[in-house]
């Protein structure tokens, strides 16, 4: 294996993933103990949120809950899964994405109730808003694909089915289950999930009020500026971290 587990190995990345898990929970996308985030580390390994003997849920994730495993779920360094830690049952959901999508480095899997409810109600995630959430609108342009099976994605075959439904899109819904978001960074993957959840919530509100969902006109879409990564990701992420800091 070449190295021994230490909380100081990839310490910054472990802490970043732990904070991202807490953001998911604080935003209501990962209630309880379900959900996980991973980050590619090198060619054949990833840091992933694991479950230990004192599991308390994503809202209480610490850097020590983030462990380094290989693409088959084995410890990628000596001691990584010691202390009663285990990789998620749905690790193949992460590893198959990392195997097949070289464009992504981070994967988020969460169970947002509003996303599940909107999909079960037959409401697709569409670009129904404009400047309200420009990155979310662009993400939803053309719709967000759906993997139509409500299964636990616990093996490579099921993960391959999910990837087939996802195509080259950044997010896929899992019917009766949740969503998977993939991006170049942990922060971007979480922000994408938040945008999809927000659009799902708005869709439920609009239809509950008797309204009809309409896509943003192409002419309006063309007018939406690209505010750049420093605003769309970096500033937005500072806000998310400030929210959880204030909550604590």
UniProtKB/Swiss-Prot annotation:
Binding of a divalent metal cation, residues? 90, 109, 111, 177
Lineage runs: Bacteria, Bacillati, Actinomycetota, Actinomycetes, Micrococcales
Q: What induces it?
A: Constitutively expressed.
Gene Ontology CC entries for this record:
cytosol
Its annotated pathway reads: Xenobiotic degradation; phthalate degradation
According to its UniProt entry, one GO biological process term is:
pentose catabolic process
- Keywords from the named record: Lyase, Metal-binding, Plasmid
Cofactor(s) required, per the database record = a divalent metal cation
InterPro entries registered for this protein in UniProt: Aldolase_class_II_sugar_metab, Aldolase_II/adducin_N, Aldolase_II/adducin_N_sf
As for what it does, the entry says: Catalyzes the decarboxylation of 3,4-dihydroxyphthalate to protocatechuate (3,4-dihydroxybenzoate) during phthalate metabolism.
Output this protein's name.
Answer: 3,4-dihydroxyphthalate decarboxylase
Known PANTHER family for this protein? 3-OXO-TETRONATE 4-PHOSPHATE DECARBOXYLASE-RELATED, FUCULOSE PHOSPHATE ALDOLASE
The EC number(s) given in the record are 4.1.1.69
Q: Does the keyword Zinc-finger apply?
A: no
Source organism: Arthrobacter keyseri
The UniProt pH dependence field says: Optimum pH is 7.
Q: Which GO terms describe its molecular function?
A: aldehyde-lyase activity; metal ion binding
């Amino acid at each position: 294996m070449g190295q021994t587990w230490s909380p100081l190995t990839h310490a910054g990345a472990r802490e970043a993933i732990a904070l991202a898990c807490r953001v998911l929970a604080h935003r209501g996308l990962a209630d309880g103990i379900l959900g996980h985030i991973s980050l590619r580390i090198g060619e054949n390994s990833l840091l992933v949120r694991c479950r230990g003997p004192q599991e308390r849920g994503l809202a209480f994730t610490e850097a020590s809950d983030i462990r380094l495993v290989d693409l088959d779920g084995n410890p990628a360094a000596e001691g990584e899964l010691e202390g009663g830690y285990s990789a998620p049952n749905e690790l193949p959901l992460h590893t198959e994405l990392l195997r097949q999508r070289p464009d992504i480095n981070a994967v988020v899997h969460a169970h947002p109730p509003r996303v599940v409810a909107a999909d079960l109600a037959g409401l697709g995630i569409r670009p129904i808003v404009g400047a309200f959430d420009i990155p979310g609108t662009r993400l939803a342009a053309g719709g967000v694909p759906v993997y139509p099976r409500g299964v636990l994605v616990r093996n490579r075959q099921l993960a391959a089915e999910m990837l087939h439904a996802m195509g080259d899109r950044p997010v896929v819904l899992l019917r009766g289950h949740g969503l998977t978001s993939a991006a170049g960074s942990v922060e971007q993957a979480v922000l994408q999930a938040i945008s999809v959840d927000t659009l799902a919530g708005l869709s439920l509100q609009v239809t509950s009020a008797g309204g009809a969902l309409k896509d943003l006109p192409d002419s309006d879409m063309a007018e939406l500026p690209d505010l750049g990564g420093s605003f769309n990701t970096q500033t937005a992420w500072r806000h998310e971290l400030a929210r959880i800091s204030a909550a604590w």
